[in-house]
Amino acid sequence: MSTNSESNARTMIGKVVSDKMDKTIVVMIERTVKHPKYGKIMKRRTKLHAHDENQVCRVGNTVKIRESRPLSKTKSWVLVEVIS
C-alpha cells in the first residue's frame, strides 16, 4: 500500500539555498512560464522546505525531493537523493 502512494507522489529537482536548520533544507525550484497576454517567457521561483534526515546536503547542491505527509507547519517534502 505504501509503495502505491509513493509512486504517485510528486518529485522535483532544485538547488539547495539554505541548510542552516537541523534536518531541514530549503530548495529553490525554478520554472519558466509564458505570460498569458504578452507571450514573454518569464522565470518563476518557489522555495520548498524539505526533510534531510542525515544532514548530507550543502548549499549549492542539486537535489531531488519527493512530496510527503506534512512534517511540520512548512515542511512537507523529503530528500530523495543528492544529484551533485
UniProtKB/Swiss-Prot annotation:
GO cellular component term of the entry, any: cytosolic small ribosomal subunit
GO molecular function, one term: structural constituent of ribosome
Domain of life: Bacteria
InterPro entries named in the record: NA-bd_OB-fold, Ribosomal_uS17, Ribosomal_uS17_bact/chlr
A single BP term in Gene Ontology: translation
This protein's UniProt keywords: Ribonucleoprotein, Ribosomal protein, RNA-binding, rRNA-binding
NCBIfam families: PRK05610.1 (NF004123), uS17_bact (TIGR03635)
Family per record: Belongs to the universal ribosomal protein uS17 family.
Quaternary structure and interacting proteins, as annotated: Part of the 30S ribosomal subunit.
Cited function: One of the primary rRNA binding proteins, it binds specifically to the 5'-end of 16S ribosomal RNA.
The protein's name: Small ribosomal subunit protein uS17
